[in-house]
């Protein structure tokens, strides 16, 4: 059956290739282990204008490779497209000790595509192993990694940018700007990759990331003495990123960037003029940013529709920004603030802000069927309008309560809230605290803008307003009220804008709501 499968697959691939393309079949014997092989591995160099296709008939493992030449690698392409057709085999690189551009695969010609497709397991670990290495995959053309069961990039280094994948656009080049497309892979991991430039894991002009299973960018790091950003991913000036989660969750956690000895958490950095084209997840899936997004100043403001539908396919999942994974000493504004300088519309599903984060946008609006959830201490900050249709606030604790904030900064900006729903954590042991024996009030929500006329508050609702604990130890109900405050000076003598505050009051020993 395996022989028949290989024959049919290879025949189909062969028919799809240009007539003059070079086809190379790879067997287990094409692997290499420098720990037991005294002979140096000769680079596989291709230069066919019509393209080269490597078709796998067996698993191929390449490990413990050491090259003394500065420009050496394992696979080097100098002309035409380069295809690696996996045929459900394993293809792994491990412990590559080389300093060439792209220790594993180097595609050195623009306006081409490097494709790795249909593998059971595709892995680049410590490839390269050395800090002076220059990344696992380097391509002047576009890179496509697709339809594989498991794809892993772990522990790779680059003395330039993008320790896992780097697709630079060379100044003066007449080639089109390269892109990276990661699509249809069922398990995708980028972990512990380190670069000395932009993008700890990936640096490219355009990135399309479409996941079909659990995926993560974890503990990647970018550092430089002068200029560094994009702990996991860096998007070049004028570029774009599109994220679509079709199954499972996509998680960004523990990614950092350092400059001048200062280390901050960062998942994705958009350089000047770069933009999100899509940010979406299907129902019961999500994108979780435990590290912030950063965005260089942009003179052109573009639209971003979060959870935008695609034809008949809807996206009703969760896009989450959270400070949950920060250690106590890491809690600061830089590690909690995500910036996307675009006009954002929430089309469906849930946008969640939790654990003290701030989300800074150019403007925000949402469709009525979508939900914005904010936990105490979080902020939605917009230069322009902040038009919120449906806000949910979950109360877990009333001690040291910090209000939710929605703020618009421009002089003509508007803050509007159509519906506010306040819910309480499902456990009731909280009511055993002594403060519930007496009435108290906490500031729940602050709307801040240029004037009273710019702050519009609509319907407010409470879940479980009536509370009765076991043995009637605590009885009472919650209520909402609001007040307006003119501009003032805070304790640091900074101007606080016009404010409308919604208060949450606990009323004890009441047997029925008034």
UniProtKB/Swiss-Prot annotation:
The keyword Ribonucleoprotein does not apply. Keywords: Cell outer membrane, Cell wall, Membrane, Secreted, Signal. Pfam families: Chlam_PMP (PF02415), ChlamPMP_M (PF07548). It is found in: Secreted, Cell wall; Cell outer membrane. Residues 1-21 form the signal peptide. Belongs to the PMP outer membrane protein family. This is Probable outer membrane protein pmp12. The lineage of its organism: Bacteria, Pseudomonadati, Chlamydiota, Chlamydiia, Chlamydiales.
């Amino acid at each position: 059956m395996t022989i028949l499968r290989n024959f049919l697959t290879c025949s189909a691939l062969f028919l799809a290739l240009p007539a003059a393309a070079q086809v190379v079949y790879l067997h287990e014997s094409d692997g290499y282990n420098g720990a037991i092989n005294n002979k140096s591995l000769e680079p596989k160099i291709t230069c066919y204008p019509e393209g080269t296709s490597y078709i796998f008939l067996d698993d191929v493992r390449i490990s413990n490779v050491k090259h003394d030449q500065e420009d050496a690698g394992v696979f080097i392409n100098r002309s035409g497209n380069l295809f690696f057709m996996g045929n459900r085999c394993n293809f792994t690189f491990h412990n590559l000790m080389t300093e060439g551009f792209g220790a594993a695969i180097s595609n050195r010609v623009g306006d081409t595509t490097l494709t790795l497709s249909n593998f059971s397991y595709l892995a680049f670990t410590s490839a390269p192993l050395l800090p002076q290495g220059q990344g696992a995959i380097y391509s002047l053309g576009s890179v496509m990694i697709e339809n594989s069961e498991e794809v892993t990039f772990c522990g790779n280094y680059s003395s330039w940018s993008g320790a896992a994948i780097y697709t630079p656009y060379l100044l003066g080049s007449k080639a089109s700007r390269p892109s990276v497309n990661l699509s249809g892979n069922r398990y995708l991991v980028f972990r512990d990759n380190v670069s000395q430039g932009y993008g700890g894991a990936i640096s490219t002009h355009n990135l399309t990331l479409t996941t079909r299973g659990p995926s993560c960018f974890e503990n990647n790091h970018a550092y430089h003495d002068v200029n560094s950003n994009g702990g996991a991913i860096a998007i070049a000036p004028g570029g774009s990123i599109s994220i679509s989660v079709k199954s499972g969750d996509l998680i960004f956690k523990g990614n950092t960037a350092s400059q001048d000895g200062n280390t901050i958490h960062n998942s994705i950095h958009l350089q000047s003029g770069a933009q999100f084209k899509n940010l979406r997840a299907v129902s019961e899936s999500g994108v979780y940013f435990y590290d912030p997004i950063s965005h260089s100043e942009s003179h052109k403001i573009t639209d971003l529709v979060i959870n935008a539908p695609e034809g008949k396919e809807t996206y009703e999942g969760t896009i989450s920004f959270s400070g949950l994974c920060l250690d106590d000493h890491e809690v600061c504004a830089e590690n909690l603030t995500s910036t996307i300088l675009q006009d954002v519309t929430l089309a469906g599903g849930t946008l969640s802000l939790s654990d003290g984060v701030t989300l800074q946008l150019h403007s925000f609006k949402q469709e009525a069927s979508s939900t914005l959830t904010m936990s105490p201490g979080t902020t939605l900050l917009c230069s322009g309008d902040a038009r919120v249709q449906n806000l949910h606030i979950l109360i877990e604790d009333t001690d040291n309560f910090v209000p939710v904030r929605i703020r618009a900064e421009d002089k003509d900006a508007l803050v509007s809230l159509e519906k506010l729903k306040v819910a309480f954590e499902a456990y009731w042991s909280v009511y055993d605290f002594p403060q519930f024996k007496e009435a108290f009030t906490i500031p729940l929500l602050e709307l801040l803008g240029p004037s009273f006329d710019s702050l519009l508050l609509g319907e407010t609702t409470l879940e479980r307003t009536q509370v009765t604990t076991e043995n009637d130890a605590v009885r009472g109900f919650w209520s909402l009220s609001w007040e307006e405050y003119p501009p003032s000076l805070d304790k640091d003598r900074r101007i606080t804008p016009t404010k409308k505050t919604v208060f949450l009051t606990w009323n004890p020993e009441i047997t029925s709501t008034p």
